[in-house]
């Protein structure tokens, strides 16, 4: 193995792409085979990147949520083809917008949009494959009032009506049923709040708060620490400074407007789609189990090998694949909550490798064929080149290094 070219590339990220700091960890057969840190945790104060640094994982959270859902499918508490209303009755009556418009960030349909009754129910598999018709409106839903949460600086506290003992995660996702669907379930693909809804479903079937479930059934068995929705004061101090690209360029500015977090600003909301905060080492311990037959480095089983094979299976084709291609995951299709490599010519990694990424630049690759994982973290928002250029290049350089 020769990682020299990869190391050189990572060291050039600040100059070429404006990345203030980064951390990359590669494992094979549960063992770390490469790790390299670059730059600064806080660029303005020249505080160097450290191994115990924490990041907002954003949508890299989705991979963890899929493990939880698949565990409950294995336990027989959730069925792939169960209707969502079985767990959240609010989704029993659904409305679909009459016209397919260019809905998107900041322009989602609301309850006033012309709609008609849906002809199809939402099923669990529709949520897992992002074909449910939901949108990605992360603004607090109708009926929620916000106030400052004195116990968590910068976060908000929410008040909503709901059943006694019901978590805010469930309340928010039940309220989200008011939003009209973008299309009939199963007919198109759209990036959405599906994983957040699935987190609420896990809470319903287990009777546990989502964070408690993840800690007991995923993080502890993996030996993973510092993965949380609710960082304590000590963990907050280890958070990397968050930056945002200026107009899509490599010029990075400190991100002072945390309203970009949307629902994740709610102190008690546990977003299965993007709410986790964590470090590179802890996250890598979890995904290493997926690359090694579902068994953690501690010898505890998270998932069966059958479930791992399901993650390696693509589900988008035809119209659905055309929709997914707008995400610019070249060579990939979408599977059960993750991207799946389906075109060998576009990557040095093997067919069936899967994973996802996060808005601040996190990158997840799980390769069960070679028992390999890649987890890369940085902390910059709104810079597309990270996803279309940096992530694929890191992937290919890792595999080149393994071949040398």
PLM features per residue range, with description:
Residues 2, 6, 57, 61, ...:
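Hydrophobic (often cysteine-bearing) scaffold residues that line and stabilize catalytic clefts
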Residues 2-57, 77-79, 93-106, 341, ...:
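Short, conserved catalytic-motif segment at the N-terminal edge
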Residues 7-10, 30, 56-84, 93, ...:
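Active-site SXXK
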Residues 18, 117-121, 366-368:
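Extracellular/periplasmic catalytic domains that process cell-envelope and extracellular macromolecules
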Residues 39-41, 257, 380:
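A generic structural motif
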Residues 92-351:
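Short, surface-exposed loop or secondary-structure junction motifs
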Residues 337, 358-366:
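Short glycine-rich, acidic/polar surface loops and turns
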Residues 364-365, 371-380:
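Short, well-ordered beta-strand elements
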């Amino acid at each position: 193995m020769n990682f020299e070219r990869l190391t050189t590339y990572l060291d050039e990220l600040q100059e070429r792409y404006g990345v203030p700091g980064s951390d990359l960890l590669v494992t094979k057969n549960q063992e770390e085979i490469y790790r390299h840190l670059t730059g600064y945790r806080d660029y303005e104060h020249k505080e160097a990147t450290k191994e115990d640094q924490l990041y907002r994982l954003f949508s890299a959270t989705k991979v963890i949520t899929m493990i939880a859902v698949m565990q409950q499918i294995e336990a027989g508490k959730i069925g792939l083809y169960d209707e969502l209303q079985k767990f959240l009755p609010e989704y029993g009556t659904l409305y679909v917008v009459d016209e397919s418009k260019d809905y998107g960030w900041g322009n989602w349909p609301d309850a006033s949009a012309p709609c008609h009754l849906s002809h199809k129910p939402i099923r669990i598999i529709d949520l897992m494959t992002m074909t449910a018709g939901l949108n990605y409106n992360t603004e607090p839903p109708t009926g929620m009032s916000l106030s400052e949460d004195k116990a968590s600086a910068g976060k908000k506290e929410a008040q909503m009506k709901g059943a006694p003992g019901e978590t805010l995660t469930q309340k928010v996702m039940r309220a989200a049923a008011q939003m009209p669907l973008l299309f009939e379930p199963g007919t198109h693909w759209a990036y959405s709040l599906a994983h957040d809804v699935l987190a609420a479903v896990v809470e319903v079937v287990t009777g546990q708060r989502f964070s408690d479930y993840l800690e007991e059934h995923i993080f502890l068995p993996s030996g993973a620490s510092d993965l949380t929705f609710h960082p304590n004061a000590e963990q907050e101090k280890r958070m990397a400074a968050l930056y945002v690209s200026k107009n899509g360029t490599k010029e990075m500015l400190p991100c002072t407007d945390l309203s970009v977090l949307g629902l994740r600003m709610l102190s008690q909301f546990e977003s299965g789609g993007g709410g986790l905060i964590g470090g590179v080492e802890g996250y890598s311990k979890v995904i290493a189990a997926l690359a090694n037959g579902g068994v953690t480095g501690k010898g505890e089983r998270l998932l069966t090998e059958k479930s791992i094979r399901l993650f390696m299976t693509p589900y988008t084709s035809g119209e659905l694949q055309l929709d997914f291609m707008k995400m610019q995951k070249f060579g990939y299709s979408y599977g059960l909550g993750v991207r799946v490599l389906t075109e060998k010519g576009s990557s040095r990694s093997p067919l069936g490798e899967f994973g996802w990424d996060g808005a601040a630049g996190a990158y997840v690759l799980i390769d069960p064929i070679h028992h390999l994982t890649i987890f890369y973290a940085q902390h910059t928002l709104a810079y597309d080149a990270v996803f279309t250029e940096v992530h694929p290049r890191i992937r290919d350089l890792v595999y080149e290094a393994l071949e040398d």
